Design a protein with these regions (language model features):
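Signature for the C-terminal beta-barrel architecture of outer-membrane proteins
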Residues: 21-26, 34-53, 62-63, 68-69, ...
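Acidic, small-polar-rich N-terminal luminal/periplasmic segments of exported/outer-membrane proteins
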Residues: 76, 80, 90, 94, ...
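Bacterial Sec-dependent N-terminal signal peptides
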Residues: 1-27
């Protein structure tokens, strides 16, 4: 199937409300992607029945002082080819309110978050891949002292225009030794740890499925000159694995190990990586 790009339009408005009157500022952008498709006999692909497909997004953000609220309106009429067909219709799946002050950052509504390398928690958006698994709930970030960053959250994961049945609870702490102890020199040290728990009610009378599944991770980042090392270990417990039968409940722990070593200088970059993932 061959596609013809009819229109890809982005509009950005930096100011819609004058800040001189102390009313705050409204920012926004609008994007629409319309595509038309034709038959491609070489791969036996047929054109879409709708002739024209469209993905459109409208973002609106209001900001005043330390306070921000925003929303995103999404329209899939119908979704572009290669997008999941469950992206269909119109709605406002993303809206939030956020307040920041003196090391405190509070968000209610939708938000994106990643702990470490994302082994046990990664809520992110990539419209090009058709991925948006934002969390809807409450997130708290706090910096009690220089170099210590704490995050706590609870929410439900977005699934297209709905939300999953499970509830995600998580906490993360990152400790930058150089910032906390005012260390000087070329070497920087950052330690981190995370904990995530998922609750999902067991509505299956045939199996004794765990309603709470937990995962934890620890990470280390060392930077020296052009060298950068990042390592993280994650462990998950109490989760079903493989097929489950009436006479056997298969529960197993999972683990993942990530090691990244990079070196860079002008005109040269070297990366060595190793990833091990089992039942995560």
């Amino acid at each position: 199937m061959k596609k013809i790009l009819l229109l890809s339009f982005i509009f950005i408005s930096p100011y819609l409300l004058l800040s001189q009157n102390n009313l705050g500022q409204i920012h926004g952008n609008f994007e629409t992607n319309l595509q038309s498709y034709t038959d491609d006999p070489s791969i036996d692909a047929l054109a879409a029945d709708e002739i024209i497909l469209n993905n459109a997004y409208l973002n609106i953000l209001y900001a005043k002082g330390n306070f921000r609220v925003g929303l995103r309106y999404e329209s899939y009429l119908n979704a572009l080819q290669d997008y999941d067909s469950r992206y269909q219709g119109n709605g406002i799946p993303y809206r939030f309110a956020r307040y920041t002050s003196d090391g405190l950052d509070v968000t209610v509504g939708n938000y994106y978050e990643q702990f470490g390398n994302g082994l046990i928690l990664r809520a992110y958006e990539d419209k090009g891949l058709g991925i948006d698994n934002s969390l809807d709930g409450v997130r708290l970030k706090y910096t009690p002292i220089n170099g210590l960053y704490i995050t706590g959250l609870i929410g439900e994961s977005r699934t297209y225009f709905e939300y999953s049945e499970g509830i995600i609870r998580g906490a993360d702490a990152e400790f930058n030794l150089n910032e906390s102890f005012k260390l000087e020199g070329e070497t920087s040290y950052i330690l981190g740890g995370s904990f995530v728990s998922r609750f999902q009610k067991d509505n299956n009378p045939a199996f004794n499925l765990p309603e709470n599944v937990a995962a934890m991770s620890a990470r280390l980042n060392i930077m020296h000159g052009g060298f950068n090392y990042y390592g993280e270990y994650a462990h998950k417990i109490n989760d079903p694995v493989g097929s489950i039968s009436f006479d056997k409940n298969n529960y197993a722990s999972g683990k993942a190990i990530v090691n990244n070593l990079t070196y860079s200088q002008k005109g040269l970059g070297i990366t060595i990586e190793s990833h091990f993932v089992d039942h995560m």
